[in-house]
């Protein structure tokens, strides 16, 4: 099937992918635009996974103040080059992360940042709750693990559902930007203040 330049251009405009990548995706899917988007997304996220281990020492520190100065967030997000740090896509991502922190009040950046004693304390609470509810011993560990995942979704920034689209997490949002920008992106740290706390 012959793929028209206008179809390739439409796919490029909608995805931000390169011309040849769009053409190959359309050829692979027989000219189906929606399937081609999925192919590009899968390839993009595969590339994003490869970039995750790379050093990220450039980036931005972003300040967000909300509610007439009653709530503030300071977040550091790193990327690999100053060029990417200056792009609108990167700046928008950093702002969205700051809004997420302001709205959802996470306590940790990543699961690895949660202290082991906090995890053990949470597990003990969930285990006792399950026992008090009379749950069978053989399923208590699964219940505890499920509740621990919910704890991560509420307290860990990267695991939280994105406030603008809860079908993806903040980690997914970052992976999409890694695929788009071609560089590793890391949320280094954040602080959230509420007046009077």
UniProtKB/Swiss-Prot annotation:
Keywords: Cytoplasm, Elongation factor, Protein biosynthesis. Disulfide bonds: none annotated. It holds the Pfam family EF_TS. Residues 81-84 are annotated as: Involved in Mg(2+) ion dislocation from EF-Tu. It is found in: Cytoplasm. GO terms for cellular component: cytoplasm. GO terms for molecular function: translation elongation factor activity. InterPro entries: EF-Ts_dimer_sf (IPR036402), Transl_elong_EFTs/EF1B (IPR001816), Transl_elong_EFTs/EF1B_dimer (IPR014039), Transl_elong_Ts_CS (IPR018101), UBA-like_sf (IPR009060). HAMAP family: EF_Ts (MF_00050). Belongs to the EF-Ts family. Associates with the EF-Tu.GDP complex and induces the exchange of GDP to GTP. It remains bound to the aminoacyl-tRNA.EF-Tu.GTP complex up to the GTP hydrolysis stage on the ribosome. This is Elongation factor Ts. It comes from Coprothermobacter proteolyticus (strain ATCC 35245 / DSM 5265 / OCM 4 / BT).
């Amino acid at each position: 099937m012959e793929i028209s330049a206008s179809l390739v251009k439409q796919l490029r405009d909608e995805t931000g992918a390169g011309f040849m990548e769009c053409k190959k995706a359309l050829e692979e899917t027989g000219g189906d635009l929606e399937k081609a988007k999925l192919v590009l997304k899968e390839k993009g996220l595969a590339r994003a996974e490869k970039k995750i281990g790379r050093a990220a020492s450039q980036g931005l520190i972003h300040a967000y103040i909300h509610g007439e100065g009653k709530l503030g967030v300071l977040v550091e997000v790193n990327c690999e080059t100053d060029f990417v740090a200056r792009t609108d896509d990167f700046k928008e991502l950093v702002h969205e992360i700051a809004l997420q922190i302001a709205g959802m009040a996470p306590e940790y950046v990543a699961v690895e940042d949660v202290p082991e004693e906090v995890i053990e304390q949470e597990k003990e609470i969930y285990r006792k709750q399950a026992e008090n509810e009379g749950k069978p011993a053989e399923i208590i560990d699964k219940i505890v693990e499920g509740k621990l995942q919910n704890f991560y979704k509420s307290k860990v920034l990267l695991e939280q559902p994105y406030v603008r689209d809860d079908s993806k997490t903040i980690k997914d949002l970052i992976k999409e930007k890694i695929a788009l920008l071609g560089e590793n992106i890391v949320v280094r740290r954040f602080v959230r203040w509420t007046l009077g706390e």
